[in-house]
Amino acid sequence: MIIFPAVDIKDGQCVRLRQGVADAVTVFSPDPEAMARHWEGLGAKWLHLIDLDGAFSGKPRNFDLIARICSGLSIPVQLGGGVRDAATAAAYLEAGVKRLIIGTLALADPDAFAAICAAHPGRVGVSLDAVDGNLKVKGWVEDSGRTVEDVLPGLSAAGAAFVVYTDISRDGMQSGVNLPALQRLLELTDLPVIAAGGVATLDDVKALYPYGKKGLEGLISGRAIYEGTLDFPAALAYIAEKAKEDA
């Protein structure tokens, strides 16, 4: 199982939001590049990078910064936020992003999403961001009118390589993971799933670990590792030790 440290970029800074609300911002660093290197230095195997400005505007807003982050790391980067056309997807992948997370476009234009998946096999995943099972789009500010159950079969058929599932009500709240919702999602798809929203402590990591055998590829942690309620090196050590036991 992979623990993805999250670096969310807004106005050129590394921030965290609460429940995706644009005005509920905490700035954790004025230097996202340094923060990305920090997590790599602590042992991260992947970086989860989000262009919040892009998510809210629908267009890349931090492209050059993101390219520099990718070039400055030896670990792979997965990126989401504002990827809403084929040209943007191709540009990011050429700039060093290892894989993309697409949400709004995947729901609004499944054919365009399928074309991007076909052009970059294995490198494009779908972001499913939900409140009580109802999916949100455009930076989590609009209701899509659909549920996870509605869209998963089509997205899998379109060629999505993985799913990033965020429980918006728990994002940035450090309130624990919605395990029943995660369990339902894992039962609905054979795609690898990455969970986000609510991871607060090592106990949450321990609670999620058994789901690795059910299709959970990893978890994303943001506020908890920035504020220290989750000790990132300790979480990595726990995962490594459990992997040895299971080998």
Swiss-Prot record:
Active site residues per record: D8, D129
GO biological process, one term: L-histidine biosynthetic process
Highest taxon above the source species: Bacteria
Enzyme Commission identifier(s): 5.3.1.16
Compartment(s) where it occurs, according to its Swiss-Prot or TrEMBL record: Cytoplasm
GO MF, one annotated term: 1-(5-phosphoribosyl)-5-[(5-phosphoribosylamino)methylideneamino]imidazole-4-carboxamide isomerase activity
Pathway: Amino-acid biosynthesis; L-histidine biosynthesis; L-histidine from 5-phospho-alpha-D-ribose 1-diphosphate: step 4/9
Record's keyword annotation contains Amino-acid biosynthesis: yes
GO CC annotation: cytoplasm
UniProt-listed CDD domains: HisA
Reaction(s) this enzyme catalyzes, per UniProt: 1-(5-phospho-beta-D-ribosyl)-5-[(5-phospho-beta-D-ribosylamino)methylideneamino]imidazole-4-carboxamide = 5-[(5-phospho-1-deoxy-D-ribulos-1-ylimino)methylamino]-1-(5-phospho-beta-D-ribosyl)imidazole-4-carboxamide
Keywords of the record: Amino-acid biosynthesis, Cytoplasm, Histidine biosynthesis, Isomerase
Protein family: Belongs to the HisA/HisF family.
Protein name (record): 1-(5-phosphoribosyl)-5-[(5-phosphoribosylamino)methylideneamino] imidazole-4-carboxamide isomerase
Organismal lineage: Bacteria, Pseudomonadati, Thermodesulfobacteriota, Desulfovibrionia, Desulfovibrionales
